[in-house]
Amino acid sequence: MEINEKLLRQIIEDVLRDMKGSDKPVSFNAPAASTAPQTAAPAGDGFLTEVGEARQGTQQDEVIIAVGPAFGLAQTVNIVGLPHKSILREVIAGIEEEGIKARVIRCFKSSDVAFVAVEGNRLSGSGISIGIQSKGTTVIHQQGLPPLSNLELFPQAPLLTLETYRQIGKNAARYAKRESPQPVPTLNDQMARPKYQAKSAILHIKETKYVVTGKNPQELRVAL
């Protein structure tokens, strides 16, 4: 396969420029006490707002959507340009169409979609979660499974359509209802991996910059 070196160089330069501009010192010391009232901080373009630490769910009729640390922040579209807002809209719609509630959290301890999903299923009342990386890679996970095991994995993010994301939501809800749905059908393109491999790696590195060791997941209010 012919590699477009000019395009690859441009992608790398753009990402490095963005990363350089967003460098911040990281401190693990406890923040100084403040007398100012705390308010929820908007994330990204404002459709996601952190509203506090995510709590353990008690209702079995919920599925948690656990997103990566840069989702809706440094990255607002997936690897092929689908807006994160649209992706969440479809996943939530799919869950709700099955009569199940959706809860969205942001995970900070890892940028790996499997570990993001595991944090989600541990807090999910049903034990079912959907993990979504900022680049779009998605997994349906179940409490009790090892991180690298799953119910359904969607590794080829460039081939995931909005309709696919909706079907992922529907299947996750069916698992929450203890059903055994047929796996979501997906496209398969052997050239997708080599075509997007460099960009995928760069986007993963970019998301990893937002990992905060030891930080617990945050509940997100979603404005769609």
Curated annotation (Swiss-Prot):
UniProt EC number: 4.2.1.28
Gene3D superfamilies linked to this entry: B12-dependent dehydatase associated subunit
Family annotation (SUPFAM superfamilies): B12-dependent dehydatase associated subunit
Effect of disrupting the coding gene: Cells lacking this gene are defective in aerobic degradation of propanediol and display no propanediol dehydratase activity. A triple pduC-pduD-pduE deletion releases no acetaldehyde when grown on propanediol.
GO terms of biological process kind: propanediol catabolic process
Pathway: Polyol metabolism; 1,2-propanediol degradation
Range of residues in the leader sequence: none
Regulation of its function: Inhibited by glycerol.
Intracellular or extracellular location(s): Bacterial microcompartment
Organism superkingdom: Bacteria
Induction (record text): BMC production is induced by growth on 1,2-PD vitamin B12 medium. By either propanediol or glycerol.
Region (Targets protein to the BMC): 1-18
Keywords for the protein's UniProt record, in alphabetical order: Bacterial microcompartment, Cobalamin, Cobalt, Lyase
Database matches in Pfam families: Dehydratase_MU
GO molecular function, one term: cobalamin binding
Cofactor(s) required, per the database record: adenosylcob(III)alamin
Reaction(s) this enzyme catalyzes, per UniProt: propane-1,2-diol = propanal + H2O
GO CC field: propanediol degradation polyhedral organelle
Domain notes: The first 18 residues targets this enzyme and foreign proteins (tested with GST and eGFP) to the BMC. The cargo is only detected by Western blot in broken shells, strongly suggesting this protein is normally found inside the BMC and not on its exterior. PduD and PduP compete for encapsulation in BMCs, suggesting PduD also binds to PduA and/or PduJ.
Assembly: The propanediol dehydratase enzyme is a heterotrimeric complex composed of a large (PduC), a medium (PduD) and a small (PduE) subunit.
Assigned protein family: Belongs to the diol/glycerol dehydratase medium subunit family.
Function text: Part of the PduCDE complex that catalyzes the dehydration of 1,2-propanediol (1,2-PD) to propionaldehyde. Required for S.typhimurium growth on 1,2-PD as the sole carbon and energy source. This subunit is directly targeted to the bacterial microcompartment (BMC) dedicated to 1,2-PD degradation, and is also responsible for targeting the other 2 subunits (pduC and pduE).
Note from the entry: Bacterial microcompartments (BMC) 100-200 nm in cross section are formed during aerobic growth on minimal 1,2-PD-B12 or anaerobic growth on 1,2-PD-tetrathionate medium, but not during aerobic growth on glucose, anerobic growth on glucose or pyruvate-tetrathionate. BMCs can constitute up to 10% of total cell protein.
Protein name: Propanediol dehydratase medium subunit
Species assigned in the record: Salmonella typhimurium (strain LT2 / SGSC1412 / ATCC 700720)
Taxonomic placement: Bacteria, Pseudomonadati, Pseudomonadota, Gammaproteobacteria, Enterobacterales
